[in-house]
C-alpha cells in the first residue's frame, strides 16, 4: 500500500496542539494546521499595529497582535504564517508564540479548540507531513530520533537521516531493483516468444551488487544501534555483590533498591548514563545463584537473556567472598558463553579487603580478564572503571562524518528480508528456475526496501511510529 492510499481520520481537518514542553517558561508555542486555519486564526487574532488579515498574509511572515476570546484578551502573541504547500505539514499552518505560563498556554489551546480545531493525536503533524509527501517515513522517524538524542553521535546520525542521506542510498537501491524487475516483467509479458531481455549472467551480477549494498547497510546496524540506544551494559554477579550500589553510583542517583538481603533485585532495572560522549544503557540484573522461588528463577532467566544481548558485561564480585574459586569458574563460563560481548571483571568492596592487590592479580590470572578494583559504596575506583568501559567500546561508538547508519530495528529487519529475497533470486537463477519465481523474489525485495521510506506502508506501522511522538509534533 502506498501513502496516497492511506487517509487521515478526517483529511485536512484543523488540528491544534502545544508544541513546546509543558511547564513554566518565558515563551510557548501553540500550532494549528489544516484546511481553513488562516480564516480560523483571523476570528481570534487582532493585529496591534496596522490592519489586514492573516488569511491575506504571505507565507513565512510574523505578525504581532492579541488573541481574543470574544471581547476578552487572552494574550499578546506573535503569529507565524505558513502557506501550503510550504509548511511542515504541507497544509496551511499558524504558530502562535505566547507567554509560557501553563494557564495562558492552556487558554490559547482551548481558544483554538473552541473555534474549530480538534486536539492533535501524538505525532499527527509529522504524520501529515509524511502523508502529504513533505517527508518520507525514514525522515519522519529521524525527527523523533533527533528530539530524543542524548549524545552528539545520536544527534548527528539523526540529522543525517533527516537530511535524507539514508533515503538517497535506499532510493538508489530501489531504482536499480525497479529496473531489474521491469526487465523480468517484460520477459513475462513476452513469454510465448521466449525472449530474454537481459542475460542471466548480467542479472546475476546486478543482484549480487544490490545484495552487497544491502548487506553493507545491514552491517552498519550494530554501530547504528549503539549510537541510537547506547552501549548495552549488563551488571552481573552473585547476590549481594553490590550490583545495585554500583548502578546507583554510576548513575549518580538512587535508582535501585540496596539491601544486605541476597536476591533483592528479582528483575532487571535499566538506566542510562553518558561518559565521554558515549551513552551506556546499564542493566542491573538479578543475582546469579540457584533460585529458591519461581519468581527469582524467572529473574535469573531474564538476567541471562540480557547478557546474551549485551555489548559489554561487567561481572561484579565481592573481594571478601569465601567462594572465590566458584566466582572464577562463573566468570570463565560467562566469558566463554558470550564471546561477542566485551567483558570486564569488577572487584568490589576494595575498602574492606586487606590484601586487595594480591586478590585482584589472582582474579586476573584465574580468569584471563581485565580486573578493576572499586568500592561501589564510597566511589573509589569508579572514574577508572568508567575510563576502562569507554576504552573497551570506543571502536563501537566511533562515528565517521561520512557514515550512513541504520539505527532502527524496523529498518534492519526490512533490509534483512530484502537481502534474503535477493539471495533467493540468485539461487533460482542458478537453478534455471521459472522467470515468475525470480520476478516474485525481486518484487519482494523491492517492497521490503520501500517499507523503510514509506513507499510501501500499512496503517499499523504508521501508528507504531507516530504514537511515539509527542502531541505537538
Curated annotation (Swiss-Prot):
Pfam family membership, one: TrmE_N
Domain annotation TrmE-type G: ranges: 230-394
Localization annotation: Cytoplasm
EC number: 3.6.-.-
Superkingdom of source: Bacteria
Any Gene Ontology biological process: tRNA methylation
CDD domains per the UniProt record, alphabetical: trmE, TrmE_N
The protein's required cofactors: K(+)
Binding sites annotated in the UniProt record for Mg(2+): 244, 265
Entry function: Exhibits a very high intrinsic GTPase hydrolysis rate. Involved in the addition of a carboxymethylaminomethyl (cmnm) group at the wobble position (U34) of certain tRNAs, forming tRNA-cmnm(5)s(2)U34.
Family assignment from sequence similarity: Belongs to the TRAFAC class TrmE-Era-EngA-EngB-Septin-like GTPase superfamily. TrmE GTPase family.
Protein name: tRNA modification GTPase MnmE
Species whose genome carries this gene: Chlorobaculum tepidum (strain ATCC 49652 / DSM 12025 / NBRC 103806 / TLS) (Chlorobium tepidum)
Gene expressing this chain: mnmE
Amino acid at each position: 500500500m502506498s501513502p496516497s492510499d492511506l487517509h487521515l481520520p478526517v483529511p485536512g481537518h484543523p488540528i491544534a496542539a502545544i508544541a513546546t514542553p509543558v511547564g513554566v517558561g518565558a515563551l510557548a508555542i501553540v500550532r494549528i494546521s489544516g484546511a481553513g486555519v488562516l480564516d480560523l486564526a483571523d476570528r481570534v487574532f487582532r493585529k496591534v499595529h496596522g490592519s489586514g488579515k492573516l488569511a491575506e498574509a504571505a507565507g513565512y511572515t510574523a505578525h504581532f497582535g492579541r488573541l481574543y476570546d470574544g471581547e476578552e484578551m487572552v494574550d499578546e502573541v506573535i503569529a507565524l504564517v505558513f502557506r501550503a504547500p510550504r509548511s511542515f505539514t504541507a497544509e496551511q499552518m499558524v504558530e502562535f508564540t505566547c507567554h509560557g505560563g501553563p494557564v495562558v498556554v492552556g487558554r490559547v489551546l482551548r481558544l483554538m479548540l473552541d473555534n474549530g480545531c480538534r486536539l492533535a493525536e501524538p505525532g499527527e503533524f509529522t504524520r501529515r507531513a509524511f502523508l502529504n509527501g513533505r517527508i518520507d517515513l525514514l525522515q519522519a522517524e529521524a525527527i523523533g530520533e533527533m528530539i530524543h538524542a542524548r549524545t552528539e553521535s545520536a544527534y548527528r546520525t539523526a540529522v543525517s537521516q533527516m537530511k535524507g542521506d539514508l533515503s538517497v542510498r535506499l532510493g538508489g537501491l530501489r531504482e536499480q531493483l525497479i529496473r531489474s524487475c521491469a526487465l523480468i516483467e517484460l520477459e513475462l509479458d513476452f513469454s510465448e516468444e521466449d525472449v530474454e531481455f537481459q542475460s542471466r549472467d548480467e542479472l546475476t551480477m546486478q543482484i549480487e551488487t544490490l545484495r552487497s549494498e544491502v548487506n553493507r547497510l545491514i552491517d552498519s546496524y550494530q554501530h547504528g544501534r549503539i549510537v541510537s540506544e547506547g552501549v548495552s551494559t549488563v551488571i552481573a554477579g552473585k547476590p549481594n555483590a553490590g550490583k545495585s550500589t554500583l548502578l546507583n553510583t554510576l548513575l549518580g542517583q538512587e535508582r535501585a533498591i540496596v539491601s544486605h538481603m541476597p536476591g533483592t533485585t528479582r528483575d532487571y532495572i535499566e538506566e542510562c548514563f553518558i561518559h565521554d560522549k558515549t551513552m551506556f544503557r546499564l542493566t542491573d540484573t538479578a543475582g546469579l545463584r540457584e533460585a529458591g522461588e519461581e519468581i527469582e528463577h524467572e529473574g535469573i532467566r531474564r538476567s541471562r537473556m540480557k547478557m546474551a544481548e549485551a555489548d559489554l558485561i561487567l561481572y561484579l564480585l565481592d573481594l571478601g567472598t569465601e567462594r572465590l574459586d566458584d566466582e572464577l569458574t562463573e566468570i570463565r563460563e560467562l566469558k566463554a558463553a558470550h564471546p561477542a560481548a566485551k567483558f570486564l571483571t569488577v572487584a568490589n568492596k576494595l575498602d574492606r579487603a586487606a590484601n586487595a592487590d594480591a586478590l585482584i592479580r589472582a582474579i586476573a590470572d584465574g580468569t584471563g580478564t581485565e580486573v578493576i578494583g572499586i568500592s561501589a559504596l564510597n566511589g573509589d575506583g569508579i572514574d577508572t572503571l568508567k575510563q576502562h568501559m569507554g576504552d573497551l567500546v570506543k571502536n563501537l561508538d566511533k562515528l565517521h562524518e561520512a557514515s550512513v547508519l541504520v539505527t532502527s530495528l524496523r529498518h534492519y529487519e526490512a533490509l534483512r528480508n530484502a537481502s534474503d529475497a535477493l539471495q533467493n533470486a540468485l539461487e533460482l537463477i542458478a537453478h534455471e528456475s521459472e522467470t515468475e519465481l525470480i520476478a516474485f523474489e525481486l518484487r519482494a525485495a523491492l517492497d521490503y526496501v520501500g517499507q523503510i521510506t514509506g513507499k510501501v506502508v500499512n496503517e499499523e506501522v504508521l501508528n507504531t511510529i507516530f504514537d511515539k511522538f509527542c502531541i505537538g509534533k
